[in-house]
Swiss-Prot record:
Pathway: Mycotoxin biosynthesis. Keywords: Heme, Iron, Membrane, Metal-binding, Monooxygenase, Oxidoreductase, Transmembrane, Transmembrane helix. Heme binds at residue 457. It comes from Clonostachys rogersoniana. One of its GO terms (cellular component) is membrane. Its EC number is 1.-.-.-. The gene is verB. CDD domains: CYP503A1-like (cd11041). It comes from the Eukaryota. The keyword DNA-binding does not apply. The chain crosses the membrane at residues 5-25. The lineage of its organism: Eukaryota, Fungi, Dikarya, Ascomycota, Pezizomycotina. One of its GO terms (molecular function) is heme binding. This is Cytochrome P450 monooxygenase verB. It is a single-pass membrane protein.
Amino acid sequence: MARPWLSASVLITAVILLVDYLNYYRLRKRLGGIPVVGDASYFWRRIRWTESDTNFQKVIQHGYDTFSKKAKPFAFWGQHEDFILVLPPGSCEEVKHLGPEKLNFLQAVEDSYHFKLHTNILGRSHVDAVRQSVNKNMNQLHEIVVKKAEETIPKLFDDIAASNEPFAAFLTIWHLVHIVSASYLVGTEFCANEEYLQAIEYYCINVPNFIYGYFWVPVPLRRLYWYLSPQGYKVRACKAKLKTFIVPKIRETISAWQNGQKSSSYTLLGAMLDLKAQKGQIKRDPTAMTKAELERQIDIFSDEMIFTGFDSAGPVACMVTQLLFEALRDKDLTKALRQELKSALEANNGQWNVQAMNLTPKLDSFTRESLRVNGPTLLSVTRTVMEPMQLKSGLSLQSGSIISSPSWLIHNDEDNYENAHQFDPYRFYNPSTNAVTTKVTTASTNFLGYGYGTQMCPGRHLGIKMSQILFSKLLMRYDGEFADAKAGKPANIVTSGQVLPPYYAKVILKRRGI
């Protein structure tokens, strides 16, 4: 008996797999003769049973040792189902001045996460607002972070410390960072809004989780996965909930601005509004825009605010966690940092002000060393090629390709740093002058923690300052140890783009002096 449904199913499946394979072939052809590490046959790649999936650190190290060390490019198959082209060390000098019209970081983020499905991130208002406003308001931002940290840390950690029970450090620090960052991203009232905090944290976790499944399915089925999968629904529902909090705040801010009212406290939302006004995207005269255009701009505005929450908290949470972990495993370092902080505070009447934090060169060196060894970036200077170009080496870059630099491997290369695999908290500290030899945020071809060139992370100064304040507050208030004291600091998680602290690694804290 004929079974037409079975024949149709087989045919449809064959067509889907053929289209998916042809997409891979197209992407592979775009690479030309560039060698690929960790690649495998179509079937094993499709079910993600390759060496890249099981031991990516080994794969990327092999590519670096075999090709990068000989000034040659290589590529690997990323989790976004496309190749990432790893340029040879030193290529950063050639591309560092190229703007987003030629090499675009935000487009690379879009291509890697497909934010276009749910969030508009390609407008540059959030990036330009950070670049134009954060550094000149740094003193006020410093005060905001200190105040909110002093309010929040005891609430989150004192009961945990009193219980003497192990807890997942990263997850609690993650929550702390979201509370503190909300105060200067959207407004202090959001720090106490548990529904907003739950939604933004959920969004930040579920977007990467969704994308992992989205890119796992063959190309022709991805739109269906977005609309029909539980994971896609969770992202859509979470974003809709976030908009119920953020859109009214944007409307309120625009209305106050149109009426000539000015906020006494800095927020990135306010800075973005000023920038949008400069660009003519939002008008001070309410009658100068149609209702439809205003609604469109508010929708874009809210998307940019949501993405900023996604983009800003993760690196700081990782940094604070890594600093805490390194301090927990080195009691002498903990003692030295506490003494330095104590002296800096005494010199400033106990105030955690900018001047006090400027008197902590050991902390600066320690922070830079943690960035060198512990990420959070595995790759840096990541860009999507917007138009075909050729490097001086003769390497041709095709439009649509994603390029990057092997920053973490460069940081751990003995040719760049003596005893590179050893964590030395004083590597960038000069004891004879009691000063850092290189500032935490200074980039070079051998230090790419925050990128390089004109598209370096514009929020790096605030990110470092916030990380140091939160870590220092924890260090001065609590003693601690790893739950598994014998095992010590747990190994980092190395993914195809990041070096992360283990999310569930547990520590035990205790109030100092108690």
